[in-house]
């Protein structure tokens, strides 16, 4: 038997490749985490220091003391509220498209096509509109914008998940005297739960990582963490420790969300892949 065809060798190669891929994806996160605790001397040391010799918690303390950490809370409010609104409206719209054929067969394609428009092409008209209404640097302004941009994606995704739910189950519930709202809450939502969570996670991440709209439409009160990070880049020098610390704070909510919803997320993505 050839050497590479032996079961033990093939298994070792698989584990080796898997380990290499894990290191490639995990190392940048580890390095970012270490930089957030390093002194400037350790950050620019050569050869590089693979870990912080003296952990500088002051990098994080400074963010909270100066109020910069509030930008993470701003991002959480904007992303969280817009995700909830988009999921409620988008799921109901998707249900209407599937069960009542609202707008015909081409409406869903038209809706998702709106999401393909590049944000940079419309950011200036939106800015002028927000100046007119006085929505610049406001929570409700960005929440409305994020919701509007998330709705096409939510409708498209939830349309596919709802189509997989047998119509007979809903008809049986209606025959038993349930209202359409009861059917939604007791039949459709529980059966599409994995799809709901998967869609919500990606919707949340879109709003959480937004930079362009937050940069143009905020000033001082509603700055998000993505915009705040750019304030640490200067013409003469960059505050790399603050950049790393703010980046760590900005990634924690996403990591925690994905960790708690991992089971539903994987199942929801798998359902979509099987359907496709």
Each predicted region: which residue ranges?
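A hydrophobic, multi-pass inner-membrane permease signature
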Residues: 1-276
């Amino acid at each position: 038997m050839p050497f590479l065809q032996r079961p033990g060798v093939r298994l070792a190669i698989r584990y080796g490749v898997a380990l290499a891929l894990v290191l490639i994806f995990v190392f940048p996160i580890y390095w970012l985490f270490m930089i957030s605790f390093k002194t400037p001397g350790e950050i620019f040391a050569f050869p590089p220091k693979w870990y912080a010799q003296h952990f500088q918690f002051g990098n994080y303390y400074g963010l909270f003391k100066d109020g910069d950490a509030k930008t993470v809370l701003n991002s959480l409010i904007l992303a969280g509220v817009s995700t909830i609104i988009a999921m409620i409206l988008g799921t109901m719209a998707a249900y209407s498209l599937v069960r009542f054929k609202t707008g015909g067969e081409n409406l869903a394609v038209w809706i998702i096509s709106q999401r393909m428009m590049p944000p940079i092409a419309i950011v200036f008209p939106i800015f002028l509109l927000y100046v007119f209404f006085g929505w610049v640097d406001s929570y409700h302004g960005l929440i409305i914008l994020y919701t509007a941009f998330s709705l096409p994606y939510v409708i498209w995704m939830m349309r596919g998940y709802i189509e997989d739910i047998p119509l007979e189950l809903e008809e049986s519930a209606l025959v038993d005297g349930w209202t359409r709202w009861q059917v939604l809450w007791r039949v459709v939502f529980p059966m599409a739960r994995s799809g709901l969570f998967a869609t919500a996670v990606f919707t949340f991440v879109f709003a959480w990582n937004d930079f362009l709209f937050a940069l143009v439409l905020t000033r001082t009160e509603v700055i998000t963490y993505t915009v705040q990070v750019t304030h640490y880049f200067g013409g003469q020098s960059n505050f790399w420790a603050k950049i790393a610390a703010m980046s760590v704070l900005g990634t924690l909510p996403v990591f925690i969300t994905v960790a708690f919803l991992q089971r539903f997320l994987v199942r929801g993505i798998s359902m979509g892949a099987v359907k496709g």
